[in-house]
Amino acid sequence: MGKVSKSPGKGEKRIGKVGKKNGKSNAPTEGSNSGKASRFTMSERNLGLMQEIIRKDPESYKEEFLEQFNYFVQTMKLLHLQPEQSRQEMQSLVDSVLFLSGLAKHYPKESKQFSDSLFELLREQGAGLDPEVRMAFCKALVLLRNQDMIDPIILMETFFELVKVEDKVLRKFLLSSISAHLKRVYHKKKDVKMLGKIQNLCFSKMKDSRSIVARAAQLVCIDAFRRKFWRDARTANVIAQACFHKVAKIQVTSMKFFLGSENENGDAEDSDEMDSDAEDNTKTLKEVMTSFRNVKKTRKREKNVERAKKMISKKKKAKKEGRSKECNLMAIQSLYDPQEFVDRLFGAVEAKKMDNFEVRLFKIALCARIIGIHRLHTLSFYSYLHRFLQPKQRDVTKILLYAAQACHEMVPPDTVEQLIRVIANNFVTDRNSPEAMTVGINAIREILSNCPFAATEELLRDLSEYKTYKNKNVSMAARSLITLFRAVNPKLLARKDRGKPQEKDDEDEEYNGFARPKVHDFISGAEILDEDAADGEQGHLEEDGTDSELDVSDVDTDDVDTDDDADEPVAKKKRVEQKSVENDAESDADDEEIEDEEEMDDEEEEIEISDEEEEEIDDEAEEEAVVEEEASEAVEKDPKLKASKNSMDRIMTQEDFKNIKAYQLKKQLIGEKRLKKQMGKGRSQADERIVDEMAEKLELKRSSDGLARLSDIEHFYKKKRQSKEERMADVMAGRADEDYKFGRPKKNGAHVGRTNDQNSKKKVFAMVKNKIRGRNRQRSFRDQQKSLRHYLMRQSGRKPQ
């Protein structure tokens, strides 16, 4: 059993066949000048040419295909006996496999046997094959799948079995091929049934006892969720169950998926559009290499190409990392039972099992994130954090961040107060460094911004005294805490720190306590709506009344003397007429004529109203008008009454809500100005900076998931002075990524401020040839003569004068 030999007589037979089909002899003649073989010589190096010929006429060249197929079958039998042969020994088989896989759709019967042979060999001898041979077989199967010649589910099952082979390149190829097939099914075919089958297969593989197979299925599910192939609650919960896997690496992968933030500002919308814009404005690696291939190779150009390649790879990596941090908020919100999940995960944290500190920190972070988003009650979590709240603790700023994220308005104030006391006693003391004090006050501020009910007057006033501390960072952190409670509950502050009230009623305002939500009985901002529009709508509705009202008003109108100037009597007459009609309906049929006459007499008596009654009605109308006028004046003076009246008396339209939103934004800007005026006439730029930053943070929390960021905890207003070594290290690190050379920026984008001359050099010549020809025609005879003289002098090697 030595090396695999080529099929006997293969080349000669092919030559004869092809020559016969073309009606020519392909044997090289003695008078051949070039001495090259014919273009139809079917040796191992031109199987690609044979493949193109067979694609044009599969039936005529079926014999050549069968010849290669028989050679493949015989070689596979040998490979079953000796699977460990190298790539050099099996090169002919690899070429034959790629040849047959490209023509499989033209010969379905043979392709079925071909794919079965590949599946059988990979399942039985996959681990013992040469890596390159194994990779070639997998690529052939992927090609067959793309041609719909094999079942994708069977192929994926085979790929998951091959994941256990210790071949890093193969694993990467298998996972990428599965993701590519998902993308193809989702975007091109829109086959929901096939997506469901693949999803069920991946979910079953995540429960596999082999950790490497479970991890591969986990990576496929995470990638499909991020790329919106399987963005549903079922996928998110299956990934969440991997947080309790026995292998720590699988746990960390799932927890990283849930913990990755969308971005620092919480905005993940239009990320695909931003990525596409970035791709349009930057050159691809293929464009860079193509332009470099067609120019003279110099040292400068080689450096530029290397720099461009580094920049492109860096942007690809940044894009991949940005995609990996998406969708965590949606995944957390999709959990079926977040309370049970947090209790189980926190139980694993509290267990005596010795986990790595990084793994334990990931579990604490995930618990805090889910507690904060879902407003859960896991009170033992806060007391568990007490042991880690020490300035010398490893990653203490992250633990402070998790404590702030886990606090929300539904946590009992006494629990949060204990947490704040621990932070204040361990961090905000004179025996600690200014950095530790700053971090502690920042953490307390973030906790109290989520749980303002936990603040006590004593603690808050003690922390406010640090506004005059000698260190700038500590004093600014204390001022930011004061600024927060000026907007939340200024009564807890000392009188000198409260500032001026923003509104007239702020001094008498009652601030809600714990579990007492503030209920609005009107739409805030509805006072700006115009009442005339509402009156017009009501009048229009009154005109379009019901049929019954119209019928009643039309009864016996001939017998009633109408008066246009007296609206009230007319209304009373109509009510009287309605009563008479009802009485007519109740009369007996026998005495109908007599009772009709009597009722007509009674009706005439009731209609005749005396002058005294008319005067009384007029006085009542005037009194009602005066009362309504006074009430309208009171409503105009009090915006709350006007807003309440507009909210109750009209039906809001989309235009009304748009006007209210614009008014609220304007009012918010005015409120910020009033907040700055609270500082007094002698306010500093630092105070204004605190106010602006606090407003940005509050707006950020309202617009995103509402959780604190690590930059809020580690925020220092005045950075520590760096040493010379640190500054030089920053300089050297920046030079590797610099986009500037000799003071000029690198022009990589499509629109980066090039001049018209530079842009004209890149235009296609067909676009500018007419312009150049016209420019030459417009030149004077003197200019043409001068140009010709300079040209002739340059041609002769002389310098033009």
UniProtKB/Swiss-Prot annotation:
<dbReference type="GO" id="GO:0030154">
    <property type="term" value="P:cell differentiation"/>
</dbReference>
<dbReference type="GO" id="GO:0005730">
    <property type="term" value="C:nucleolus"/>
</dbReference>
<feature type="region of interest" description="Disordered">
    <location>
        <begin position="495"/>
        <end position="517"/>
    </location>
</feature>
<keyword id="KW-0690">Ribosome biogenesis</keyword>
<feature type="region of interest" description="Disordered">
    <location>
        <begin position="739"/>
        <end position="801"/>
    </location>
</feature>
<dbReference type="Pfam" id="PF08158">
    <property type="entry name" value="SDA1_HEAT"/>
</dbReference>
<dbReference type="GO" id="GO:0000055">
    <property type="term" value="P:ribosomal large subunit export from nucleus"/>
</dbReference>
<feature type="compositionally biased region" description="Polar residues">
    <location>
        <begin position="24"/>
        <end position="40"/>
    </location>
</feature>
<dbReference type="Pfam" id="PF05285">
    <property type="entry name" value="SDA1_dom"/>
</dbReference>
<feature type="compositionally biased region" description="Basic residues">
    <location>
        <begin position="770"/>
        <end position="779"/>
    </location>
</feature>
<dbReference type="InterPro" id="IPR012977">
    <property type="entry name" value="SDA1_N"/>
</dbReference>
<dbReference type="InterPro" id="IPR016024">
    <property type="entry name" value="ARM-type_fold"/>
</dbReference>
<keyword id="KW-0334">Gonadal differentiation</keyword>
<protein>
    <recommendedName>
        <fullName>Protein SDA1 homolog</fullName>
    </recommendedName>
</protein>
<comment type="function">
    <text>Required for 60S pre-ribosomal subunits export to the cytoplasm. Required for normal somatic gonad development and for regulation of germline development and proliferation.</text>
</comment>
<keyword id="KW-0221">Differentiation</keyword>
<dbReference type="InterPro" id="IPR027312">
    <property type="entry name" value="Sda1"/>
</dbReference>
<dbReference type="GO" id="GO:0007506">
    <property type="term" value="P:gonadal mesoderm development"/>
</dbReference>
<keyword id="KW-0217">Developmental protein</keyword>
<dbReference type="InterPro" id="IPR007949">
    <property type="entry name" value="SDA1_MD"/>
</dbReference>
<dbReference type="GO" id="GO:0015031">
    <property type="term" value="P:protein transport"/>
</dbReference>
<keyword id="KW-0653">Protein transport</keyword>
<dbReference type="InterPro" id="IPR048292">
    <property type="entry name" value="SDA1_C"/>
</dbReference>
<dbReference type="Pfam" id="PF21638">
    <property type="entry name" value="SDA1_C"/>
</dbReference>
<keyword id="KW-0813">Transport</keyword>
<keyword id="KW-0539">Nucleus</keyword>
<feature type="region of interest" description="Disordered">
    <location>
        <begin position="1"/>
        <end position="40"/>
    </location>
</feature>
<comment type="similarity">
    <text>Belongs to the SDA1 family.</text>
</comment>
<dbReference type="GO" id="GO:0042273">
    <property type="term" value="P:ribosomal large subunit biogenesis"/>
</dbReference>
<feature type="compositionally biased region" description="Acidic residues">
    <location>
        <begin position="583"/>
        <end position="633"/>
    </location>
</feature>
<feature type="compositionally biased region" description="Basic residues">
    <location>
        <begin position="787"/>
        <end position="801"/>
    </location>
</feature>
<feature type="region of interest" description="Disordered">
    <location>
        <begin position="536"/>
        <end position="647"/>
    </location>
</feature>
<feature type="compositionally biased region" description="Acidic residues">
    <location>
        <begin position="544"/>
        <end position="568"/>
    </location>
</feature>
